[in-house]
Amino acid sequence: MMITLRFVSSTDLMARIIRGAELGFAYQHVEAKMPDGTLLGAHLDGGVQARAADYDTAYVADLYVSVPCSADQEAAFETFLRAQVGKPYDVVAIAEMADGVVTGEAPSWPDSPSWICSALITAGLLTAEIIKAAPATVRLATPRDVLVACSALTIIGEPKQNPGVSTIRS
């Protein structure tokens, strides 16, 4: 069995803030490709949602990563993510990243009332026991942290450039 994660590079303000927190890492967003083809993730606009696969036309590059797991882990990952749909975006976490001020991890992160994209995916991977430990505090995990955690489980491929966008801007 596999779960598929989509890492995305964009040029908007939020992407630039996250890129700074990630020390220039190429991807500023991560979401899960669900079995029905939707992309489930957390965005500033709309919080946690399952969006149509073609919703994102302004990306610069994306990278799909297939992560091996058992059928039970795949089901637990999907169940956890779907239970988060409707929760708002964690704007405070992004502000803390931008300011370099971290208030710490809430001990009840599985029940978080809001999510950033990478914290959502990290929590799903942990809940499903696909990864055994968070690569950073769950609440402030970045897409880079998620990719590093997954790189121990699978071969990471090449990104696909969006032909409609020419470059990644800082």
For every predicted segment, state its role:
Residues A71-G100:
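A structural motif
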Residues L40, Y89-D90, A133-A134:
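Secondary-structure boundary/capping residues
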Residues M97-S170:
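Activation targets extended, charge/polar-rich intrinsically disordered C-terminal tails
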Residues Y27, F77, C117-L120:
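Generic hydrophobic secondary-structure packing signal
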Residues M2-Y27, P143-V148, G157-R169:
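Donor-binding and catalytic core of enzymes assembling or modifying cell-surface/extracellular glycoconjugates
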Residues T4-A71, T103-D111:
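Glycine-rich catalytic cores of cysteine/serine-nucleophile enzymes that process amide/ester linkages
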